[in-house]
Curated annotation (Swiss-Prot):
Belongs to the universal ribosomal protein uL24 family. Keywords: Ribonucleoprotein, Ribosomal protein, RNA-binding, rRNA-binding. This is Large ribosomal subunit protein uL24. One of its GO terms (molecular function) is structural constituent of ribosome.
């Protein structure tokens, strides 16, 4: 069970974007793509068959999952634990003990 999932609100713990918050757009193995964080400029070649123009495009690049943490209700970074409730595994915030939606 992944502790961080698509749609979770996270904060960046390390790197050039430290302290920034965003929503997880995708989880790719041990990496996550966070909205508005770790944006790189990519040069795109024009493709007339697809109708795309060339130029410099902003692209979201993945971060390692260990460099982000979920945000609790107080706005602080929190680690995530796994708990069994009614025979199902649920994610629980370590700081507040709140159960996260599945």
């Amino acid at each position: 069970m992944n502790k961080i999932r698509k749609g979770d609100e996270v904060i960046v713990l390390t790197g050039k974007d430290k302290g920034k918050r965003g929503t997880v757009q995708a989880v790719q193995g041990d990496k996550v793509v966070v909205e508005g964080v770790n944006v790189a400029k990519k040069h795109a070649r024009p493709n007339p068959m697809l109708g795309t123009t060339g130029g410099v495009v902003d692209k979201l690049m993945p971060l390692h999952i260990s460099n982000v943490a979920l945000v609790d209700a107080n706005g602080k970074p929190s680690r995530v634990g796994i708990k069994v409730e009614d025979g199902k595994r649920v994610r629980v915030l370590k700081t507040t003990g709140a159960v996260l939606a599945a």
